[in-house]
Amino acid sequence: MVIQKEKKSCGQVVEEWKEFVWNPRTHQFMGRTGTSWAFILLFYLVFYGFLTAMFTLTMWVMLQTVSDHTPKYQDRLATPGLMIRPKTENLDVIVNVSDTESWDQHVQKLNKFLEPYNDSIQAQKNDVCRPGRYYEQPDNGVLNYPKRACQFNRTQLGNCSGIGDPTHYGYSTGQPCVFIKMNRVINFYAGANQSMNVTCAGKRDEDAENLGNFVMFPANGNIDLMYFPYYGKKFHVNYTQPLVAVKFLNVTPNVEVNVECRINAANIATDDERDKFAGRVAFKLRINKT
């Protein structure tokens, strides 16, 4: 014989719910007395307080082993990469000469990027260094802080400096300037005490034909040793990265050209297929003309 469970009315359900929330006979709130709730809250307060203290202690111990100025592990930063400016999403520099909006954003980015390189700012913050040698500043047991940096003046970029330039870095005339910079690696002695320079070329034969002629600033794409080593952001507060500007003079219009620039230095490998940015950078250049 099947016994059917009596169906509760809506009023009964509400009354049972109200009694569960607060039972005036037993003085229980949601099934527990005040003392029981106090013990529960005390337990979780102690439990999470202990976890917080353990986490804080662990972080403090770990931070004691980490330098504020130099990364502890740098094995994956042995070879600096190259990057370009203006910075674009896909390393594509596309210029429509007749459309100001297509290149004005590049010009604005370059103006902001090159502002710290103004000669007046460099003269205030940085030193005139002796070229052809590293600018070493050892601590010798005493923290030598902050480190001084060598001047890299905007005027060294010649026709790509943008100073008094009505062509806007050449973008308005279809002869754009692209800036190459080497990523910073702490205590890296670039060039292994030998001169180094940046070279650019088309990636394929057809790219080389369409790339045409170009000039580089400083001359021959040279990067002087005096800008190395780099001691880190906190030590080298006013450090100014050296740049190489490439001005493309007669790129074949309306054709996408693949360009690759490399740093030629004794201790920088540029043939690692696993890291296509190690010592080199590839980008696409297109000059549209109607």
Curated annotation (Swiss-Prot):
Known glycosylation sites: 96, 118, 153, 159, 193, 197, 238
Cytoplasmic side: 1-39
Alphabetized UniProt keyword annotations: Cell adhesion, Cell membrane, Disulfide bond, Glycoprotein, Ion transport, Membrane, Potassium, Potassium transport, Signal-anchor, Sodium, Sodium transport, Sodium/potassium transport, Transmembrane, Transmembrane helix, Transport
Cystine pairings recorded for this chain: 129-150, 160-177, 200-261
Assigned GO CC terms: sodium:potassium-exchanging ATPase complex
Topological type in the membrane: Single-pass type II membrane protein
Record flagged with keyword Signal: no
Keyword Zinc included in the entry's annotation: no
Region (immunoglobulin-like): 193-290
Subcellular location: Cell membrane
GO MF terms, alphabetically ordered: ATPase activator activity
Top-level taxonomic group: Eukaryota
Transmembrane parts of this sequence: 40-67
BP GO annotations: cell adhesion; intracellular potassium ion homeostasis; intracellular sodium ion homeostasis; potassium ion import across plasma membrane; sodium ion export across plasma membrane
Stretches in topological domain Extracellular: 68-290
Domain text: The C-terminal lobe folds into an immunoglobulin-like domain and mediates cell adhesion properties.
Complex and partners: The sodium/potassium-transporting ATPase is composed of a catalytic alpha subunit, an auxiliary non-catalytic beta subunit and an additional regulatory subunit. Interacts with BSG.
Family according to the record: Belongs to the X(+)/potassium ATPases subunit beta family.
Function: This is the non-catalytic component of the active enzyme, which catalyzes the hydrolysis of ATP coupled with the exchange of Na(+) and K(+) ions across the plasma membrane. The exact function of the beta-2 subunit is not known. Mediates cell adhesion of neurons and astrocytes, and promotes neurite outgrowth.
Protein's recorded name: Sodium/potassium-transporting ATPase subunit beta-2
